[in-house]
A protein has these predicted regions:
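N-terminal intrinsically disordered, cationic/polar leader segments
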Residues: 2-146
Length: 146
């Protein structure tokens, strides 16, 4: 599994084993940064992100909804992009939109340029899903189906 990010960082993520799946936890000072960390954690569950510059910029967005719905929408969108376009996102830039949605872009590189460290997740589960304000910031917890 990917390297853990220190818990005491202002923003970060970690992966925890869970039978045949993985639990992704992410945190940040605000919702957009927590979502960005969750996206990065999902990528790092299957790929070692290169330090090279991104070759393309793709849009990513989630419509207004509850925090958990926005999280799942973004994670599923990321998995779709990886599967359909054979690219791997390496950085995310998200901002809040009116009504509670999120929009931004992701810097991507061709999938052939990353080191595969695990299987690409199949999806995201609603089981045990949580996201919300906590400890002066935002935290999320999501089960990843690998």
């Amino acid at each position: 599994m990917a390297q853990l990010t220190p818990e005491d960082a202002g923003a970060g993520w970690r992966l925890l084993p869970h039978t045949a799946d993985a639990i992704l936890e992410a945190w940040g000072p605000d919702r957009a940064s927590c979502l960005s960390q969750a996206l990065l954690g999902l990528v790092r569950s299957f790929a070692e992100v290169p330090d090279t510059a991104a070759t393309q910029l793709l849009p990513i967005a989630a419509p207004p909804g509850g925090p958990e719905d926005v999280l799942v929408s973004l994670l599923e969108d990321l998995l779709y992009v990886v599967d359909v376009f054979a690219v791997v996102p390496v950085r995310f830039h998200l901002t809040e939109t009116e009504g509670g949605g999120v929009a931004g872009d992701m810097e991507v590189v061709p999938a052939a340029e990353v080191e595969v460290v695990g299987p690409v997740p199949k999806g995201v589960s609603y089981h045990g899903l949580s996201m919300g304000p906590r400890d002066g910031g935002w935290r999320c917890h999501v089960l990843i189906d690998v």
